[in-house]
Amino acid sequence: MYTDSFSDGGKFNNLDAALKHTEEMIKDGAKIIDVGGESTRPGYTLISDEEEIGRVVPVIEAIKKNFDIAVSLDTYKTKVAEAGVKAGCDMINDVWGFKYGERDMADLVAKTGVAACVMHNKNVITYNDFVNDVVNELKESVEIAHKAGVKDSQIVLDPGVGFAKDYEQNLLIIKHVDKILELGYPVLLGTSRKSVIGLTLDVDKNDRMAGTVATTVMGLERGCRIFRVHDVKENYQAMMMAEKILKA
């Protein structure tokens, strides 16, 4: 529901288009619909809490009214998250992992009982031992959640592909995402159409489906079971095929 998304900004920023797109994604296999009112791409434009609420709440309400589907709200702002929960969202996707955004977000999650996708992110790209540092920094986010009263059953972790990582680091964290799974929480992998795919294949954002599917299958093989994608049908079918092979 914003116009400056790196991939599909502006395509679904009215209610009718959002509902039609939701219907299509559910038909294609989606189990969670992610709603966002402010882009988190590099160089994104900040908007006020009130504007963000005005963008996301009507969409959440309409989706919950018209479809039997879980809704995730992509926001790091507590006031927006609170409005989203009241509107019916089931999960908060905090791109700052309770650490660098608004620190009372974990309190809200604990109080309301919604799920929380806790993403790895940081202000400066500095690491001593990259993969272990990401794992340990996600542990810190989990500790913040626990101190606020968030239960383990509410927590999903996200390695944060494309956030506070260079090209090689993005490849490494996809390769070693199983290390994050060792923390004992479900892991969401979000690679869809991201620059690591564009740089690898030398393709623009509109031609990254094949690369996205490859990362989805790789993540599935390593144990991920939640994937944030734009092209639902293609990724869902690839997952189903890969899962059959893995279980054969």
Regions found by a protein language model. Give the residues of each.
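Conserved functional loop/turn residues at catalytic and ligand-binding sites
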Residues: 29, 34, 88, 149, ...
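Catalytic domains of carbohydrate-active enzymes, especially glycoside hydrolases
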Residues: 20-36
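Phosphate/pyrophosphate-binding loops at sites that engage ATP/ADP/AMP, CoA/4′-phosphopantetheine
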Residues: 26-31, 141-154
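Active-site-adjacent loop and "lid" segments of alpha/beta metabolic enzymes
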Residues: 5-21, 40-58, 62, 67, ...
